[in-house]
UniProtKB/Swiss-Prot annotation:
Keywords associated with the record: Phosphoprotein
Protein name per Swiss-Prot or TrEMBL: PDZ domain-containing protein MAGIX
Pfam families named among the record's database cross-references: PDZ
Keyword match Aminoacyl-tRNA synthetase: no
Organism of provenance: Mus musculus (Mouse)
Parts of the chain that traverse the membrane: none
Length: 324
């Protein structure tokens, strides 16, 4: 074992290093990722000792500054039995989450293709999309804002062809934009939204919601109100449909005819005076009143005070026709 690896003797034949040469203040994040092209993250101390013993006659370690959960390192293993020294270089292919302790594949990020992360909270129906700016921007247009159409909601107006938003495959025209880069869009003007996207950097994180998911309950309520409106009308038609009804139907409600005098009843004018409210109510021909509008002779005789019943009333009516 080379003395450069440490200066403390190990009773089992090795030397326990007290620090790396050339590193005056080693940091905790200066970790070795691989030894002899083998990962160290899931190995125990006894396994590390065995690997060091199998490394050869000389072991040289060169650390690099930590930039992630597992730092990259260049490891050189020299053995007198080998003609030349072997240099093993490794760059981290995975990214480790320090808080969760899980391994996740890194997202490929290019300039021409958007990389996005989709999260769908089932409770709220919202989802988030992360886009990367391309040569022509993010590839979407927005509409709405506080000064547009009286505080209209901010929505996705359209997607540019072959843009990052269209290649994402998650966005649709009409989606409601609730958050931009973690900040709510409520109360923002259209100019403020554009400025926030422009100054947000090469990445854009949007939290959206489908209109049908948000307005499902509202549509049910509106349908319930419409049903109530139809039940109020005894004919089963909508209140708005009354504007299309012929004006003849409104005449019996708006026009009131004076009560006929007894003389008019005697000469038969009462039929023509009461005929008008019944016109076109059930597609009847005007001038043909229903049977309930023709008074009986007994009622007419009692109303006019004519004695003798129907015979005397017929004589009076005949005399009236002759006079007129």
């Amino acid at each position: 074992m080379d003395s450069r690896a440490g200066n403390t003797a190990d009773p089992r034949g090795g030397r326990r290093g007290g620090g790396l040469q050339g590193s005056r203040s080693p940091r905790a994040r200066q970790l070795l990722e691989r030894l002899d092209a083998r990962p160290l993250a899931a190995r125990a101390a006894a396994d590390l000792t065995a690997l060091v013993r199998k490394a050869g006659a000389t072991l040289r370690l060169r650390h690099t500054e930590g930039v992630s959960g597992l730092d990259s390192a260049d490891i050189e293993v020299t053995d007198s039995r080998l003609p030349h020294a072997t240099l093993v270089k490794h760059r981290p292919q995975h990214q480790r989450s320090e808080t969760l302790g899980t391994w996740t594949e890194p997202l490929p990020v290019t300039q021409n293709k958007a990389s996005y992360a989709l999260k769908v909270p089932q409770a709220t129906g919202r989802f988030s999309v992360e886009l990367t700016r391309g040569p022509a921007g993010f590839g979407l247009t927005l509409s709405g804002g506080r000064n547009v159409s009286g505080d209209a909601p901010l929505t996705v107006h359209g997607l540019l062809k072959d843009g990052p938003a269209q290649r994402c495959g998650r966005l649709q025209a009409g989606d409601l934009v609730l958050y931009i880069n973690g900040q709510s869009t409520q109360g923002l003007t259209h100019a403020q939204v554009v400025e926030r996207i422009r100054t947000g950097g090469p990445h854009l994180c949007l939290v959206l919601q489908r209109p049908q998911d948000m307005d499902g309950s509202r549509i049910k309520e509106v349908g319930g109100h419409r049903k109530t409106d139809r039940s109020l009308d005894p004919r089963g038609s909508r209140v708005e449909s009354r504007s299309t009804i012929s004006p003849v139907h409104h005449r019996p409600k708006t026009r009131t005819s004076p009560r006929p005098s007894p003389e008019a009843v005697a000469i038969g004018h009462v039929v023509r005076a009461v005929e008008h409210p019944t016109e076109d109510l059930e597609n009847r021909i005007p001038g043909t009143p229903g049977p309930w509008l023709v008074p009986s002779e007994d009622r007419l005789s009692r109303a006019l005070g004519v004695r003798g019943g129907g015979a005397q009333l017929a004589l009076e009516m005949a005399a009236g026709r002759r006079r007129h």
